[in-house]
Every structure is written in structure tokens, then in C-alpha cells.
């Protein structure tokens, strides 16, 4: 009897203070006796002991084996559920829950970001609530008023101190594409929601969806350099943000000898007028094109005028442009491209003594005509431009270029854009012929991101650059033009991308002659995989910077990439969108000779508008091949942190 009561008391104590079952020493209540008896039976069933029957609790000494007892018909699951309901969650339970969560590892892990992260909806609080919050904040921390602290008043009258260096400036007024921007495609149009709390998010979504009709256009995402203007005059009267810092090319970017060798342009290019006509023809399934005012008009209605834009280095050559302010094509704006070329010519090619007059009589007038959509004034200004550049002796221009030490990066990026629009736009539909979510999915890294990552790798004119999966060749061409690599090499297996690589290389070579750029060695291995490729295997040991866009590589292909990296030299930089060495990788006797043990991996933040397949940012990695084992693999603390890292959650 006493032993049973003690067991019942012990069981109640284990349940905690949230719920206990009463034990009546006088046995006045049958309910408490039943519960206590059942608890005792439940414990002793597992121990194999014999316990007293119901009569034993009343004083009888008769005992019965456990297997001969008749268990009361009590639903144990319901009783346990009720106990769990009131039971407090302990720290041990939290640890068990965390340990039970799924953790992806190795090649099945997904790279952080690139997909929209789930965020709590932003609620529009009342003015009174925000003011109350602000008052509480001001009581805790009092901001000192200095020159660096300025206050910006929001719509809700809540003032927030912001440092001057973080102030967002307006974008230059004329952001005409001058060609299709290889930015991300606008996302799908979201369904309307009744919840008004997400109004801020809806406005930004609608702003993106309004441009969905222009399939591959993103005027502001092609070059990050054009975004934050701090010069009010530049914002109103220029196609280019001249306030951005210039850079010094690591080599003599202008080919002075080649410019002096030819008086006439030796080459054939795809003209702007041909590109404009192409976009007008495919812009609609009907024989109509959309005008700037939203109306439609026949494509061949005779409006607009063909006009030639004179080359600054070869006065005998004119590139044809179709000028028409009535029709607008958001994939390519030839008239904005004219404005950019005029400004670059004045700042880069013309000697300083001509620049002031040129700006006043050509650049400023064309900008005014573009703003007012004055076709007649635009045409007359182009004619004035042709006369002006034709009157300057070529020798003075060449001497000025030879002494040039700095250039705006936007000049090189816009030049690459001109090449891209002429060679890729007419055949862009071919790039859609691939299997989704496979190793053959096509995607591009944009020039702004490439400039940043190449600079981090220290790419220079003495380096060999390689791109495994080079697509249409953009990364290879930019490494050659902007950094002057001694050799830039790309490998591409897809037929369509390989064909467009050849077209782009022809256009690039001819455009370099027209603009006077020096061409470094560029080579490709097209329509072939980089696996078991003799040319790739011969160049890998000499490679200084290697680019692998492994965002959608499967485990098998990643394994083949690792085998190739085994031959890389010490100091080689490897750029990737997913970590070459998986988060769960550990050093053991089996993989002791693997190159993955000698990789020093650094993760960087990928800004928005860095890749073609999404507007969102993410992360990328630069791995350096060491001559020793990476210390992070030997440090237990770092190893534990690496193995327990959980990627962020994602939404569609």
C-alpha cells in the first residue's frame, strides 16, 4: 500500500507543477484511487513486478501477478495528450527540436539568397504610434547634431538620422539603354491581394511588372555605375554620370600603331539602323509598332530618317542610325546611344582645346533636342557633329589617346553593350533552347559584377583567365578588354551559345578597330565539354583566375570540376556562385590529397542586378589554392561552425 502511494507521488512530482493527480490517504474518493492505481500499474508493467489488486489497496494482502490483472479501460493516449498540453517546454526539448531539423549538405546544399527571402509584412502604423516609438527612442539615445547627421522626414513624420555618405541620390535624367540591358527579366505578375498592409511592397512589384512586355530589357540594371548621381547638372544634361571615379587600365588600351597604320576603316559591322528595324519587326505580331504616346502606327510608314554618324578615328566611315522620336523600343534606343557616343568622344577622344566648344555646340544642343523630342534639331546636331569631328586632324587625336591614362569604366561597359546588342539581340531566341534546371541552363554575369570580382582577384595583363561554361563569351571578352589579360579562354558545350560566341567575336574585333582598342589574345573551345578536354587540361596548370558559374551544376559535374582543380597551381583564384568545397566537407584519410583541403574560401555579398536570371542579390565565393592545408579544416571551432551552418529559408 505505502509503496504504491510513494510511486504515485513520485510520478506526480515528475509531471511538475502544471498538473498533479491527488492522492487521498483515507481513500474517500474512488476517482483518485483509480488514477493512482492505474499509474502504479503503468509503471510496474515495465518492471515485471507483481502489485496489489484494487482490494489490496483497501487493506487486503492478496497479491496477483501483473499479467493476470484486468487493466481498466482508460485511454492512455488521451491522458498523455492532456498532460503534454499543460507541460512546459524545457531547454532539452528545444535542443531536440533543433537537432531534428533537416540540414542539407554537400552538393545538395543550395546557395544562400538568389531567391526572395521570406519577410514579415510591413504594417503601416499610425502617426501616433510612430511618434510614441520615436519619443521612446530619443529618451534612450540622444543624437548629437553634426554636419554628418541629417534628418529625413518620412510620410509618417518619423525623422531618422542618416549619415550623409549613405544618402541616395537621384539617377541621371537620361538613362536610355543605348542597347538592351542584360539585366534580369521582370518577374511574373503577382495576384492582387486584399490586404492593404502590403501596399508598399505592391507598388514596387507593380513597377516591375509594368515592364514585363519588354522581354529582356532593364535599363538601369545593366551597369551599376549609372545609378547614383551626385551632380545635379549631370543628372539633367547628360546621358552619363561623370561624377563616378575613373580607373587606370593596367595596359595601353588604345592600339596606336594600328590606328596610324590605316586611314580607312577595315572591317564590317552590324549597324544601329539594322538593329532598330529588327526590333521594330519583331516588336508586334501585327504590322504595327508602339509609339511613345502609347498609340500604334504602321512600321513602314516612312517616318523617321536614316542618318550616318561619323567615326572619330576614320572620317570616311559612317554608321547608320534610324532617328524617330515617335516610335520607341525599350529593348534598344539608338538615339540615346548617339548621345552617349557624342559625350564619350568629347571627353576621351578630343584634345582638351576642342572640348569646351564641342560641348556647347554639339553635346548640349543634342541633349536639349532629345529632352524635347525635337527630331529636326537632333538631325541637324548630328550633322554638326559630323562636321566638327571631321575638321580635327587625326594626328592630334592619336597623340591625345596615347597620353590618356584614365578612363571611365562606363565607357568600356557601354562599348561591350554596343557589341552585345548587335551580335546577340537578333538571335536571342536561340538561347532559350535548353532543358530547365539542368547543367545546360543559360545565364549571364553582368559587367558591373565582373569588374568588381576581377578586381578582387587582382586580374592583370600578365594573367591567364579561363571561363568554364562561357556562354556567349561575355566574361572572356570583358577580362581581355578591361584588364588586358595575356590570354582569355572560354569553353562552351551548347550549340546555340557557341554560334553566338562566334558572331559576337567578329563584331567585337571589328568594333575594337573602329574605336581604336588594342585586342589581347582570346581563344575558345566551342561545342565541347570542359570534361576530358585536352585544351582545357593543358591550360589549367597555368591558369591564374578561373571562373566557374556552378549555380546549377549537379553533384556529378561538381565532382568533375574538382578533378580539374586538382591540377591548378598555387595562387590560382577560383570564382564560383556556389562554394566549391561543400559546407559539410571534412578532412580525413580518404581525401587527404584532394585540392579541396588546400582551398582558402572567402564569401562575398553579391549585389542586386549582378546576374541576368534574377534581380535579387546573393553570395559568391573566391577560393585561393594554397600550398598547405587550409587552417579552417584543422580548427575544431571553425569546423563545428561550418558543419552546423544552416542555409537561410527561401520562398518562391
Swiss-Prot record:
Keywords: Chromatin regulator, Methyltransferase, Nucleus, Repeat, S-adenosyl-L-methionine, Transcription, Transcription regulation, Transferase. SUPFAM superfamilies: S-adenosyl-L-methionine-dependent methyltransferases. Ubiquitination of histone H2B to form H2BK123ub1 is required for efficient DOT1 methyltransferase activity on histone H3. S-adenosyl-L-methionine binds at residues 442-445, 465-474, 492, 529-530. It comes from the Eukaryota. GO terms for biological process: global genome nucleotide-excision repair; meiotic recombination checkpoint signaling; methylation; mitotic G1 DNA damage checkpoint signaling; mitotic intra-S DNA damage checkpoint signaling; negative regulation of heterochromatin formation; nucleosome assembly; postreplication repair. Residues 68-83, 290-300 have a biased composition (Basic and acidic residues). Residues 49-66 have a biased composition (Polar residues). GO terms for molecular function: histone binding; histone H3K79 trimethyltransferase activity. This is Histone-lysine N-methyltransferase, H3 lysine-79 specific. The gene is DOT1.
Amino acid at each position: 500500500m505505502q509503496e504504491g502511494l510513494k510511486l504515485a507521488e513520485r510520478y506526480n512530482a515528475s509531471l511538475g507543477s502544471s498538473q498533479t493527480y491527488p492522492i487521498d490517504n483515507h481513500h474517500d474518493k474512488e476517482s483518485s484511487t483509480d488514477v493512482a492505481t492505474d499509474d502504479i500499474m503503468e509503471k510496474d508493467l515495465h518492471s515485471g513486478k507483481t502489485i496489489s489488486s484494487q482490494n489490496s489497496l483497501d487493506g487486503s494482502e492478496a497479491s496477483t501477478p501483473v499479467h493476470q490483472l484486468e487493466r481498466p479501460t482508460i485511454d492512455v493516449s488521451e491522458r498523455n495528450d492532456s498532460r503534454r498540453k499543460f507541460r512546459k517546454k524545457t531547454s532539452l526539448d528545444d535542443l531536440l527540436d533543433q537537432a531534428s531539423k533537416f540540414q542539407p549538405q554537400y552538393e545538395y546544399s543550395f546557395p544562400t539568397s538568389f531567391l526572395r527571402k521570406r519577410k514579415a509584412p510591413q504594417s503601416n502604423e499610425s502617426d501616433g504610434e510612430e511618434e510614441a516609438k520615436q519619443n521612446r527612442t530619443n529618451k534612450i539615445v540622444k543624437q548629437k547634431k553634426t554636419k554628418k547627421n541629417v534628418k529625413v522626414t518620412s510620410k509618417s513624420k518619423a525623422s531618422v538620422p542618416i549619415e550623409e555618405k549613405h544618402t541616395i541620390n537621384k539617377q541621371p535624367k537620361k538613362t536610355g539603354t543605348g542597347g538592351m540591358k542584360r539585366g534580369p527579366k521582370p518577374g511574373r505578375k503577382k495576384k492582387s491581394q486584399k490586404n492593404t498592409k502590403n501596399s508598399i511592397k505592391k507598388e514596387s512589384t507593380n513597377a516591375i511588372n509594368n515592364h514585363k512586355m519588354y522581354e529582356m530589357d532593364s535599363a538601369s540594371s545593366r551597369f551599376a555605375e549609372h545609378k547614383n548621381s551626385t551632380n545635379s547638372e549631370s543628372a539633367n544634361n547628360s546621358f552619363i554620370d561623370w561624377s563616378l571615379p575613373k580607373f587606370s587600365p593596367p595596359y595601353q588600351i588604345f592600339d596606336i600603331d594600328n590606328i596610324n597604320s590605316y586611314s580607312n576603316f577595315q572591317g564590317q559591322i552590324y549597324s544601329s539602323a539594322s538593329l532598330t528595324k529588327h526590333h521594330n519587326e519583331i516588336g508586334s505580331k501585327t504590322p504595327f509598332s508602339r509609339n511613345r504616346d502609347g498609340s500604334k502606327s504602321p512600321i513602314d510608314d516612312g517616318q523617321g530618317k536614316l542618318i550616318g554618324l561619323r567615326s572619330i578615328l576614320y572620317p570616311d566611315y559612317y554608321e547608320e542610325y534610324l532617328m524617330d522620336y515617335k516610335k520607341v523600343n525599350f529593348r534598344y534606343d539608338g538615339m540615346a546611344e548617339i548621345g552617349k557616343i557624342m559625350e564619350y568622344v568629347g571627353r576621351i577622344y578630343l584634345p582638351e582645346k576642342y572640348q569646351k566648344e564641342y560641348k556647347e555646340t554639339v553635346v548640349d544642343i543634342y541633349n536639349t533636342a532629345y529632352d524635347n523630342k525635337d527630331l529636326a534639331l537632333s538631325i541637324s546636331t548630328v550633322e554638326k557633329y559630323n562636321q566638327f569631328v571631321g575638321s580635327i586632324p587625326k594626328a592630334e587625336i592619336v597623340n591625345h589617346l596615347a597620353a590618356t591614362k584614365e578612363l571611365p569604366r562606363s565607357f568600356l561597359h557601354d562599348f561591350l553593350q554596343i557589341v552585345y546588342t548587335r551580335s546577340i539581340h537578333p538571335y536571342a531566341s536561340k538561347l532559350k533552347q535548353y532543358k530547365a534546371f539542368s547543367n545546360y541552363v543559360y545565364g549571364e554575369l553582368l559587367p558591373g559584377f565582373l569588374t568588381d570580382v576581377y578586381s578582387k582577384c587582382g586580374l592583370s595583363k600578365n594573367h591567364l583567365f579561363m571561363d568554364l561554361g562561357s556562354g556567349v563569351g561575355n566574361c572572356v571578352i570583358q577580362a581581355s578588354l578591361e584588364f588586358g589579360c595575356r590570354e582569355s579562354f572560354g569553353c562552351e558545350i551548347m550549340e546555340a551559345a557557341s554560334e553566338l560566341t562566334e558572331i559576337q567575336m567578329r563584331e567585337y574585333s571589328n568594333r575594337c578597330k573602329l574605336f581604336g582598342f588594342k585586342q589581347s589574345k582570346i581563344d575558345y573551345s566551342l561545342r565541347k565539354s570542359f570534361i576530358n578536354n585536352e585544351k582545357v587540361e593543358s591550360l589549367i596548370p597555368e591558369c591564374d583566375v578561373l571562373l566557374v558559374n556552378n549555380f546549377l551544376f549537379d553533384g556529378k559535374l561538381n565532382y568533375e570540376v574538382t578533378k580539374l582543380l586538382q591540377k591548378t597551381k598555387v595562387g590560382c583564384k577560383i570564382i564560383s556562385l556556389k562554394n566549391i568545397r561543400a559546407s559539410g566537407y571534412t578532412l580525413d584519410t580518404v581525401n587527404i590529397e584532394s585540392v579541396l583541403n588546400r582551398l582558402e574560401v572567402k564569401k562575398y555579398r553579391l549585389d542586386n542586378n549582378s546576374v541576368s536570371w534574377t534581380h535579387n542579390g546573393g553570395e559568391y565565393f573566391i577560393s585561393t589554392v594554397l600550398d598547405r592545408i587550409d587552417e579552417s579544416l584543422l580548427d575544431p571551432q571553425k569546423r563545428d561552425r561550418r558543419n552546423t551552418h544552416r542555409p537561410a529559408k527561401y520562398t518562391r
